[in-house]
Design a protein with these regions (language model features):
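Key residue(s) within conserved catalytic/signature motifs
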Residues: 77-79, 84
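Hydrophobic lipid-interacting interfaces of membrane-associated proteins
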Residues: 1-60, 67-75, 90-199
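Short structural boundary motif marking the start of a folded domain
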Residues: 86-88
């Protein structure tokens, strides 16, 4: 839980045969334990996290929240740790990552600006995260209209994912996945259609 800023400019990544140049990357952290503000500014990732949070306890805190729905999948032997209040919101935008994905051989590439929003409150064990991914690749597969939500408004965790997979020939596969978790049970529904005409 630091306060201050880190600025990096003119950072180059070189791998054969590609390279990536990062003009700027700045992280600025201000505030105190109950009112923090983290701002990220760069060519690839921009955004902010605001509220009360502790970097050392965010993951254990989320695990504790998820344990209420699927305890069999959460490690019950986690070390007991004093968990601070984690009540924050976030907004992140991801720019085109083609250059850095190619250079670092990453399996995921953003082609147009995407956005991630969300909030989490461990005192009430409530969260909601959304991701808007207009156009992206996973490996050589191309996708558009990606939308992901994960939340727990009532007595279960809900996950929804929609995306369209397409190819250069115009074939489109429309995918819709819904899942929810409660009482150590995960229910999943997958829908898959395409625009191919029957012969």
């Amino acid at each position: 839980n630091l306060e201050g800023n880190i600025t990096i400019d003119s950072l180059s990544f070189l791998t054969a045969p590609s390279s990536f140049f990062l003009k700027k990357f700045k992280v600025e952290a201000t505030g105190h334990s109950l009112d923090r503000h983290l701002a990220i500014t760069s060519d690839v990732l921009n955004g902010e996290v605001t509220g009360a949070y502790s970097f050392t306890t965010i993951v254990p805190s989320l695990m504790q929240t998820l344990k209420g729905y699927i305890p069999a999948l959460i490690n019950v032997t986690q070390k007991k740790q004093k968990v601070m209040e984690n009540n924050f919101s976030l907004l992140l935008t991801i720019e085109n990552t083609e250059a850095i994905s190619n250079t670092l051989k990453l399996p995921f590439t953003m082609l147009t600006q995407g956005r991630i929003t969300g909030h989490y409150n461990n005192l009430y064990n409530r969260f909601r995260f959304e991701a808007y991914l207009p156009k992206f690749n996973i490996g050589k597969s191309m996708f558009e209209s990606g939308y992901l939500t994960c939340d727990n408004p009532e007595d279960r965790v809900n996950l929804k994912l929609k995306a369209t997979n397409y190819n250069a020939k115009g074939l489109r596969n429309y995918m819709d996945l819904k899942a929810d978790a409660k009482d150590n049970r995960i229910q999943t529904q997958i829908s898959w259609t395409n625009n191919k005409e029957r012969l």
